[in-house]
Amino acid sequence: MRERQNSYEYEDLLACGRGELFGPGNAQLPLPPMLMFDRIVEITETGGEFGKGVIRAELDVKPDLWFFGCHFKGDPVMPGCLGLDALWQMVGFFLGWTGGSGRGRALGLGDLKFSGQVLPHVMRVQYHIDMKRIMRSRLVLGVADGWLSTDGEIIYRATDLKVGLFQQDAAAQAGK
């Protein structure tokens, strides 16, 4: 397990995807192409709307990103589910970063609103998570609100994003 930082570059995120950041069997990010951000620019255990922690990440948008070629031909747009998954990825990363053990699984959300699209001409996507609750018992559960913006304009808002960290056998059950 590496020393905890307050920001992470792309190579650090890849190390997390390989299971090298938080130790074997613990929270991992997906590897490309499903890793949906290029860097974490801020992560803290305090602050944010609820005083429970903040995580901010960014994705540099390039017209040749894999999803633009297939979603949709002649009308390229990033699938909304990928932006949502990025928010879940960040909550899981936060849980591992704070010492939670187990494998991360998205468990749902309260509400989701889209008011714009991520298109190839966008320069940067910014993601923001405000942690609301962290419960540590047989399972580690994080609940957060988050948003996604393109070039500074918020276009997705999600409430009560839920991610759990499960031990290996329980993670297999959660995925059923």
Curated annotation (Swiss-Prot):
- Active site at H71
The entry's function note states: Necessary for the introduction of cis unsaturation into fatty acids. Catalyzes the dehydration of (3R)-3-hydroxydecanoyl-ACP to E-(2)-decenoyl-ACP and then its isomerization to Z-(3)-decenoyl-ACP. Can catalyze the dehydratase reaction for beta-hydroxyacyl-ACPs with saturated chain lengths up to 16:0, being most active on intermediate chain length.
Q: What highest taxon heads this organism's lineage? A: Bacteria
According to its UniProt record, the EC number is 4.2.1.59, 5.3.3.14
Q: What is the lineage of its organism?
A: Bacteria, Pseudomonadati, Pseudomonadota, Alphaproteobacteria, Hyphomicrobiales
Q: Which family does it belong to?
A: Belongs to the thioester dehydratase family. FabA subfamily.
Which Gene3D superfamilies would you find in this protein's record?
A: Hotdog Thioesterase
**GO molecular-function terms, A-Z:** (3R)-hydroxyacyl-[acyl-carrier-protein] dehydratase activity; trans-2-decenoyl-acyl-carrier-protein isomerase activity
Q: Name one GO cellular component term.
A: cytoplasm
GO terms, biological process: unsaturated fatty acid biosynthetic process
User: InterPro entries of this UniProt entry?
Assistant: FabA, FabA_FabZ, HotDog_dom_sf
Q: Where in the cell is it found?
A: Cytoplasm
Q: Describe the reaction catalysed, as an equation.
A: a (3R)-hydroxyacyl-[ACP] = a (2E)-enoyl-[ACP] + H2O; (3R)-hydroxydecanoyl-[ACP] = (2E)-decenoyl-[ACP] + H2O; (2E)-decenoyl-[ACP] = (3Z)-decenoyl-[ACP]
* Entry annotated with the keyword Lipid biosynthesis: yes
In which pathway does this enzyme or protein participate?
Answer: Lipid metabolism; fatty acid biosynthesis
UniProt protein name: 3-hydroxydecanoyl-[acyl-carrier-protein] dehydratase
The protein's assembly and partners: Homodimer.
Q: Which organism is it from?
A: Afipia carboxidovorans (strain ATCC 49405 / DSM 1227 / KCTC 32145 / OM5)
What SUPFAM superfamilies does this protein map onto?
Thioesterase/thiol ester dehydrase-isomerase
Q: Which Pfam families does the UniProt entry name for this protein?
A: FabA
**Entry keyword set:** Cytoplasm, Fatty acid biosynthesis, Fatty acid metabolism, Isomerase, Lipid biosynthesis, Lipid metabolism, Lyase
Do the record's keywords include Acetylation? no
